[in-house]
Amino acid sequence: MIKVRIKKLDERAVLPMYGSEYAAGADLYAVEEETVGAGETRMIHTGLAVEIPEGYAGLVYARSGMAMKRGLAPANKLGVIDADYRGEVMVALHNHGRETQTVEAGERIAQLVVTPFLRVEYEAAEELSDTCRGAGGFGSTGSK
């Protein structure tokens, strides 16, 4: 198991916690109350800074219940915390619903998944190898 160092920037901040024994994502918590109007996006503070190990990234995902029941989900769909970022972890929550929503202090707002990744070298090419799919894009492989 890897260790992720966390600095509390606010005494009210709650360290990320897993909701179950096999959960992939640890819950992130709002440090203060924030109102998010219908169709609006607000930056929700966690009061935490993290030290993600080199070779890993922190991925911030929506909490399924919050998205389904209240229409609140990260505006960028997936947030990325790079290993060299040391600022406050914030979640840009967008209200997809028709009613104003209030995020309470201490409420779970997103999930943090820490995962390894590969860096690649991008190389310009005149041609790419042929495949059966070719340039077929959206919907090209069928619906079943």
Regions found by a protein language model. Give the residues of each.
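DUTPase catalytic domain/fold
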Residues: 1-144
